[in-house]
Amino acid sequence: MRKSVCLLMFSLLLGQADQAIMTLYKDGFALVKQPVNWPNVPPGVSTIEYDQLPSRLFIDSPFLTLQDEIVVRWQRINSNIFSGEKFFSRKLGKYVEIKISGGKTYEGILLEYNNAKVTLQGKSEVLSIPRDKIELIFTEDRIENPQFKPTLIWEINLEKSMQVQGELIYLSAGFDWNAVYRLVMNGKDNQANLVPEAIISNRSDVDFSDLTLRLVEGELHHAGQKKISSGSQQYSRAQSSRLASSSVSADQKSLGDYHIYTLSEVLNFMVDDNITVQLYKPRVINYEKTYIFENKERSQREEPLVVELKIINSEENGLGIPLPAGKVEMYLTSKGGSLEFSGEDYLVQTPKEGTVLLTAGRAFDITGKRTILNYDRQRNSEEASIQIQIKNIHDEDIQVRVVEHISGDWVIRDASSMYTKEDATTIYFPLNIDAEDNKIITYTYRKEWK
């Protein structure tokens, strides 16, 4: 029996995290489907182990599927991962030595051990030592076979010698992906190249070779998964050691209420990797630029206008695809042909035929000034006259939207320009302003109450 156990363990470890299928979610976790294969397993009861698991495994998630005729008698997970916190917390009442900053040493019986301090019973005194002063804690112990990762253990029963094949499935934190878009505008017209990409991150402590990767866009509900804890020795979300750009692209399909992207090639997904892949091929699109001047009813100020870009997610506009939420980096091609960064914004999940609104920053040559010309408040009413001036020093014609937020029960009177009531507290004035020109809007709002 012992020979068969050793053979099964060795065969499995040779294929550690190899040729797995990983479904990656934006919530910071992944579903891993790891193929397993043991040749020439003898008949009878055998115990097998697998320890190539992420330390942030959801402990109630793993399950092993094998051929129909194979019986898995039980499954156990050993998650007693070593940490100094747990080790010394179990040494209460034992003799320890402590060396603090400056070289002084204390010894005695350990009474208390926590994140803030360590308390000792000395020969004739009780000592409380802050943790940040401690350089070394010593105890006469030897740890046999410390465990650094969770281990899965199964017992299977075979009627005859055979090859055992199956799949280990589990959920783990430590994996993530985010969409990143590069919007490259030519600066001459309202046309741009949109490059939809994804950055996938391995923040676990397991390498994956020849990995098939799928990305799911959508917000999933969680019941509160249990993760393996190792005291204060939590796995560090270290800075990535390398960024691998790839020509790998993804095939998008629906997955129930979500969307799933399957990468076209297998990848090596190593610890601390950040890998950039294409979600879609680059698209040539059109956008609409509008300058926004937005104020509340009592505001008086002068400032540059916000630059807003609107993109229609339609086939006619080169898109018509589900756009995952993610950061949009905007670039502008200068007259000399060089590419310059011109701002960034966050794109929310946008379905087909939806509208994307992006803020690129504030315009240098386009300013707005809002002035309250008159304000009169009586016992049962309030009235204010507003003047708004937009200056376009730019050498191009522009579109402007002047947005006014007015609370309460109001009416607009004597508006000098056409406006639209957007909702109960918002109106806006759409304007077209010629190059090197300006436009002035005036209006009065009145409120009455009993």
Task: List the predicted regions and their residue ranges.
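Sec-dependent N-terminal signal peptides
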Residues: 3-13
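Long, intrinsically disordered, low-complexity accessory segments associated with secretion
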Residues: 15-450
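Basic side chains
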Residues: 2-3, 439
